Design a protein with these regions (language model features):
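Carbohydrate transferase catalytic cores enriched for Leloir-type hexosyltransferases
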Residues: 1-395
Length: 395
């Protein structure tokens, strides 16, 4: 097969992590098929060294312009690709010269971000996204939760959706932080105190306002107990400047001396933060998969996360689950994990076991099977009506 993969978002958080690790796993497992990585050659270096069967095809457009769409389509036609994998959800229908496999990470665009749009724009967005999903040769959902969302919101039959789980970036599997790593933490970031950790994107669904409020309540409880007087909350994530409400929450909660915003941290150091944290706190309101809790678990760090969306599916019995809308429930979970050492020891063991259940190689093997099934499938009338009508002449 000739397989194209759209890598134009390979440097982004989430989609980029997925794209890099899928390509790496495919390069380890597949020595038969030919792959064309369509996107920026400079960004492709983020993936690392690849065998000769993986070739980067330059396309600098970010995927949002008509010109970029035309160039993308022309590349697929010129290379005579058997299929293309687009590793993210998109909404503008595309008449491509070969079948496409699409990965859906979540439906956040339809659950939260559409609230600021008019009802007409929301309806159009929903309608066009449904057409795109119906036109896909196969849809890859990163969790059972995301699969059920696609079925319920768009009416796509479950038989056309394959659950293929995410996994941890291999750089988080290099063992515990060394004394030298912790020295860097102390010298470069001036961290010489116990801390709770949040790592991820900075956006309303991540529930950071309640994390800060729960931390403030926790400090008050710890003061009564005479425990952890120097405990801090560290928040790692970009785009803080777009969310001034977080700074206001810190000041209103009276913890301005105990909350630190560190912005972007490279993976090589992020693993040290995971390893050194007392607890990883992630009471997100909505996750299609939710990798950060799993990354923390790989280091044996206890996790407090949500009872909602995909998170119970991902963390299993290896985390403390809370109602993400209840600040005091979050606080009580944090307090319990901080003060009960036997529970911490039990959670650490479960964390290691849970993290091992997810593997990029296992996921890539299933993706390869899907590629073969889609490439071999006949173009049915139903598929043509769903968005492939213009392919009849080209195929």
């Amino acid at each position: 097969m000739k397989v194209a993969i759209d890598i134009r978002r390979v440097t982004e958080f989430g989609v980029g992590t997925y794209t890099r690790n899928v390509v790496r796993a495919l390069s380890r497992l597949d020595h038969t098929n030919q792959y064309f990585l369509i996107g920026s050659p400079q960004k492709a270096t983020e993936i690392g060294p690849l065998p000769p069967s993986f070739q980067t095809i330059a396309l600098l457009d970010d995927g949002t312009t008509a010109r970029g769409y035309i160039e993308f389509r022309a590349i697929l036609k010129r290379l005579q690709c058997d299929l293309v994998h687009i590793p993210h959800l998109f909404w503008m229908p595309r008449t491509l010269p070969c079948p496409y496999v699409m990965t859906v990470h979540d439906l956040l665009e339809h659950m939260y971000r559409t609230r600021t749009r008019s009802s007409l724009r929301r309806s159009l967005h929903l309608h066009l996204t449904r057409r795109v999903l119906k036109g896909a040769g196969r849809i890859l959902a990163v969790s059972k939760f995301t699969k059920s969302e696609i079925e319920n919101v768009f009416g796509i039959p479950g038989s056309r959706i394959e659950v293929v789980y995410n996994a941890i970036d291999e750089r988080f599997l290099h063992g515990h932080a060394t004394d030298a790593d912790r020295q860097v933490l102390a010298e470069r970031y001036l961290i010489k105190y116990p801390f709770l950790l949040y790592a991820g994107s900075i956006s309303p669904p991540k529930n950071l306002v309640r994390i800060i409020e729960a931390f403030s309540a926790l400090k008050a409880e710890l003061e009564k107990e005479g425990k952890f007087p120097d405990l801090k909350l560290i928040i790692i994530g970009d785009e803080l400047s777009k969310h001034p409400d977080l700074r206001r929450t810190v000041i209103r909660s009276g913890v301005q001396n105990d909350v630190r915003f560190l912005g972007f941290i490279p993976i090589e150091m992020l693993r040290v933060f995971y390893d050194a944290a007392k607890i990883f706190v992630f009471p997100s309101l909505y996750e299609g998969f939710g990798l950060p809790p799993l990354e923390a678990m790989a280091h044996g760090t206890p996790v407090v996360t949500s009872t909602t969306s995909s998170l119970p599916e991902v963390v299993g019995n290896a985390a403390v689950l809370v109602n993400p809308e209840n600040v005091f429930e979050i606080m009580r979970a944090l307090l319990h994990l901080l003060l009960d050492q036997p529970v911490r020891d039990q959670m650490k063991k479960r964390c290691y076991e849970q993290a091992k259940k997810f593997s990029w190689d296992v996921s890539a093997r299933r993706i390869l099977e899907v590629y073969a099934e889609v490439a071999a499938a006949p173009r049915t009338p139903a598929r043509l009506q769903a968005g492939e009508t213009t392919r009849r002449v080209e195929t």
